[in-house]
Regions:
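Low-complexity, intrinsically disordered Gly/Pro/Thr-rich segments
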Residues: 72-77
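Short S/T/G/P-rich N-terminal loop/turn motif that feeds into the first structured element of a domain
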Residues: 1-53, 57-69, 80-96
């Protein structure tokens, strides 16, 4: 299994909106992607920092979302609420 970790910095007054979009739009779209297992969003309300962790069956399925434009479409949904571009990383899951 693999994980994609995306770190965002949102305007603190927009965090509830970011959470709602993640829950109501981004996660349902992820569920339609082949190999998607699950997602979690961690937030720090004081700083506006958010960390999304999504789990995928394989590295190929994780990377397919980036190649197809899926990742970019999801980031575009919250981009107006961000204070800087997101960062993304991918890891093999050693222990689940």
């Amino acid at each position: 299994m693999y994980a994609r970790i995306v770190t965002v910095h949102a305007k603190t007054d927009k965090l509830d909106e970011v959470i709602a979009i993640y829950r109501d739009s981004i996660v349902p779209a992820a569920k339609q992607q082949k190999g998607f297992i699950g997602a979690r969003l961690f937030i720090d309300r004081a700083t506006g920092k958010g960390v999304s962790v999504t789990r995928w069956q394989s590295k190929e399925e994780l990377e397919a979302g980036e190649a197809s434009g899926y990742y970019q479409e999801q980031i575009a949904k919250i981009a107006p609420m961000l204070t800087q571009p997101p960062t993304r990383e991918a890891y093999e899951i050693g222990v689940d």
